Amino acid sequence: ALPIFYPLPALLVSCGSTEEEYNIITVAWAGTICTNPAMCYISVRPERHSYPILKRNMEFVINLTTKSMAFATDWCGVRSGKDYNKFEEMKLTPGKAKIVSAPIIEESPLCIECRVKEIISLGSHDMFIADVVNVKADDKYLNAETGKFELSEANPLVYVHGGYFELGPKIGKFGWSVEKNRSQTKEKS
C-alpha cells in the first residue's frame, strides 16, 4: 500500500557520534507529534545503513532541505553510507550541534536536534520518537519582529509520489476562515 497523506517533508537526517560514523539519510516519513514537550518522529527501515547508527546513539538531527539542496536530498536517499561519505560527496558541511553528538548540516536553514525517547517497530519501518532538545535556525529566515522562522522564505522541499516540489504561496493563516473580515485578513496574511 502506498501512503495517502501528501505532501511529505523531504528531510536530511544526520546521525553518528564521530566523524568516521557520520551519515545522512533522506527521510520523508517524519513530523511533529507533540508541542509541549516538543517531540517529533522519523520512520526508518531497519535494513538501512543509518538504522544501527540511530539505534546505537539514540540521537539525530532533522535538517530542513531547500530547493538548492534538492540534488543532495535525492542523492542521499538513493546512495548508502556503507559505500559513500555523503557529506564529502555532496559537499555538505557537518557542523557541531549544541546538545547532541550527531552533526548538523550547515547548509540547512533549520536544524532540529533530537534525542530518541522510544523506538516502535511498526512493520516495514521503525518509528523513532524523539524529544526536540535544540533548534538552530539561520538568522536570515527569522522574522525581525516576531523572531519566528519564516518557512516560506526558506523554499523548503516536499515529496509527493516520487517527486520533489517546492511549496507555493501562502493562501491563508490558521483561523482566518472565522475572522469577521476574511477577505482583508487573507490578503494581509
Predicted features along the sequence, with ranges:
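Basic, polyanion-binding surface patches
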Residues: A1-S189
